């Protein structure tokens, strides 16, 4: 049986652009691991134990195919409008303005942005998110 979720890995081309993006979301650098042909930068949110692994394959220039199986990662944010303003300063715009999914105000407002490699990130306003329990 699995005992602990360790990390989620995404492959990135431009580590500096990716670091700027994730740091704008509030992620902090936690570590780095180097190999001959690749290196990983580990990031996490200040009050969260989950880790995001950004993997750079040295010498790769072409964009990664995100594929049709991946949909998104989700993070809660304490000030969605403020975060979107900071991201806009970097030229990052949401797919569409914040909204309540399906008109469900009990869930709160969300929106989606894409990181520099096209990975979609769901931003959930309000700072907390309980796993939905619809019957």
Which functions belong to the PLM regions below?
Residues 32, 75, 84-135:
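Vicinal oxygen chelate
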Residues 1-17, 70-73, 124-135:
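N-terminal beta-strand motif that seeds the catalytic metal site of vicinal oxygen chelate
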Residues 2, 9-51:
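Core segments of cupin and vicinal oxygen chelate
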Residues 47-51, 60-61, 78-82:
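Short, charged/polar surface micro-motifs in flexible loops or helix N-caps
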Residues 37-39, 69, 107:
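Exposed loop/turn and edge beta-strand positions of beta-sandwich/beta-sheet ligand-binding modules
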Residues 21, 80-86:
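Short amphipathic alpha-helices within nucleic acid-binding modules
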